[in-house]
Every structure is written in C-alpha cells, then in structure tokens.
Amino acid sequence: MTSHGEEIEDEQISRIEKGNCKDSQGGMETAICSSPSIVCLTQKLIAEMIGTYFIIFSGCGVVVVNVLYGGTITFPGICVTWGLIVMVMIYSTGHISGAHFNPAVTVTFAVFRRFPWYQVPLYIGAQLTGSLLASLTLRLMFNVTPKAFFGTTPTDSSGQALVAEIIISFLLMFVISGVATDSRATGELAGIAVGMTIILNVFVAGPISGASMNPARSLGPAIVMGRYKGIWVYIVGPFVGIFAGGFVYNFMRFTDKPLRELTKSASFLRSVAQKDNASKSDG
C-alpha cells in the first residue's frame, strides 16, 4: 500500500524531472540546502563547478603548502582546512545547486529519488571539471614535487585504504542524509555538521588513505599529475560507503513528521489514556 506522503513525493519528483521545481516551503529538498526560487540548470552546474573548484583548491592547496614550506600548516591544520572549505561552500552555493560537490552523493540522491536522474551526468561533469581546473591551477602555482603530490594514494595496502574510505564515506552520507533530507532536522546547521564530519574523517583516515570520500577529489589531481596508483580505491570506496550511508539512514527514517508533531501526538494520547483510566476508576 502506498501512503499519501509517498504519493506526494512521487508527484514532486515528476515535477522536478520536468523542470517544474517547487520551493523549500512546498517542494522536496534535494541536498544540503533548498532554494526559495526556481534556479536554471546552468546556474546549478556553475555553482557545482565553482564549489568543487574551491574545495579542491583550498584542501589540496594546503597539502602542497605544508610539504613545500616545512610543515608550517601541520596535520591538524590540514584537517580543519578541509572541513572549513566544505562548510563555506555549502553555505555559499547550497541554495543554488544543493551543494553536492561529489559524484557519489549525486548518484545516491538520485537512487533514493531525491534528485532527478537526467541531471546526474551534468552534475558529475561539473564536479570533475571543477576538480580538474583546481588541480591544474595548483600545478601551475607551485613546483609540485613527487613528495608534494596532492592527490590520494594508499599509505600501506589498498585493502586498508578501501575499508577506511568505505567507513568514512558511510559516516559522511549518514550525516548528510540526517541534516539535509530529514524535515525534522535543523537545516541551518547542515554546513556545520557536514564540515565537522569532514574534519573528523580526515583526522582518522587521513594517515591511512588520504580521506578522499569523493571520487572527484581524487580523480582531478590524479589526471593532472598523471599518478593513478590505487585510484580504484577512491572510486569504489566512496560510492559503496556513501550509498550504504544513505540506505541505512533512509531505512531508519520511519516518518517525515517533525519531532514537535510527534511529541504533541504522544502527549495527546497520554491525556486520552489518563482520562479513560480515570473514568474507569470512577465507574
């Protein structure tokens, strides 16, 4: 049996696929932020490209600076930089494109019917373009030595790196699903929550795999620098982890009602039960 809410969601998705988007008050949120007005696809693609560009430029750039200038940034500084730039770009472009910046996130949103499939290849193309341009910019700006490679390669075995990428990608998408697609969450804090998750993930998995969580983050530097060692890890790992994170959260989310509505209903039922018990005792 199909619920009324599911019927409404299917209708909204059909409108989006036809280009008839609805705003955040009456429509479906497709990612980190929702826009109050219709935004043409070209603007969304430009926002995705610019957002991905500055994420790669800042995150990978700080890695290069740290190596070339004697470790002045330090590992904690690198972790914080990645989280901050993701947070900044979410708040800067989320209301335009949804702030995916990640092919695996885009595909997962589409799989769970929160993003139109026809836009998926266009979004992925914009994300890869942003990553390639940022990587090319860094190569032109700095004398990038093999030691200062700003891509991602497994530190030890590919198996260890794969496990690390799956776990941290799972956590990333689990958080994104919670703060971006659940109407009960506080959407204004989405950027902070996702940024903090990035910081934690880089702290934990950075020494093992480089903490990519994003095929675009790894493919751009690999293509520009011509280094493809273990690149499959950074395609398979994020896709598996992000899909699993989205699946688990969607499995857990049993209702779309805000918490205040659930608590009101619970209070009402308790009052009815108390009155019923009181009437029985009087009788």
Swiss-Prot record:
Q: Which GO terms describe its molecular function?
A: channel activity
Q: Where is this motif: NPA 2?
A: 214-216
Region: Disordered; residue ranges are 1-23
Question: What positions are modified (N-acetylmethionine)?
Answer: M1
In which domain of life is the source organism classified?
A: Eukaryota
Tell me the Gene3D superfamilies matching this sequence.
Glycerol uptake facilitator protein (1.20.1080.10)
Q: What is known of its domains?
A: Aquaporins contain two tandem repeats each containing three membrane-spanning domains and a pore-forming loop with the signature motif Asn-Pro-Ala (NPA).
Q: Name one GO cellular component term.
A: membrane
Tell me where the transmembrane regions lie: 51-71, 77-97, 120-140, 161-181, 189-209, 231-251
Q: Where in the cell is it found?
A: Membrane
Principal place of residence? membrane
Q: Which family does it belong to?
A: Belongs to the MIP/aquaporin (TC 1.A.8) family. NIP (TC 1.A.8.12) subfamily.
Q: Indicate which residues form the motif NPA 1.
A: 102-104
**Annotated InterPro entries:** Aquaporin-like, Aquaporin_transptr, MIP, MIP_CS
| The name this protein goes by in its record | Probable aquaporin NIP4-2
Phosphoserine is found on: S267
